Design a protein with these regions (language model features):
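Feature detects long, helix-prone N-terminal segments enriched in hydrophobes
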Residues: 1-100
């Protein structure tokens, strides 16, 4: 993952901690999906000499972490109260992992 996407994911993770409405969550979902798409484009179009390199494997991990975060956020849309907040917190952790 490049520096710019890492920075954007870190910002989303910080901002997500203050999310209180489902509309805000939907906006974050869209932002994460866009970043995930960009990372998938890098991953899918990596030159052969980069495939299976450390950066390539980290990209795959980041995509998986973003997928997990999106699952938690979609679950949050279905929940309220503590379950809502727990899903948000889990998504934040996954985004932090993706941004490493």
């Amino acid at each position: 993952m490049n520096k710019q996407r890492r920075k954007e994911l870190s910002k989303i993770a910080c901002d997500l901690a203050n999310a209180t409405t489902k509309e805000q969550i939907e906006d974050f979902i869209n932002d994460i999906e866009n970043l995930k798409f960009e990372e998938e484009m890098f991953y899918d179009n990596a030159p052969e000499n980069l495939q299976y390199s450390r950066r390539y494997m980290e990209s795959e991990d980041s995509i998986n972490y973003m997928d997990d975060a999106l699952d938690y956020l979609n679950n949050a849309l279905e929940c309220e109260g503590d379950d809502f907040k727990n899903n948000i917190n889990n998504a934040i952790e996954e985004l932090r992992r993706a941004a490493i």
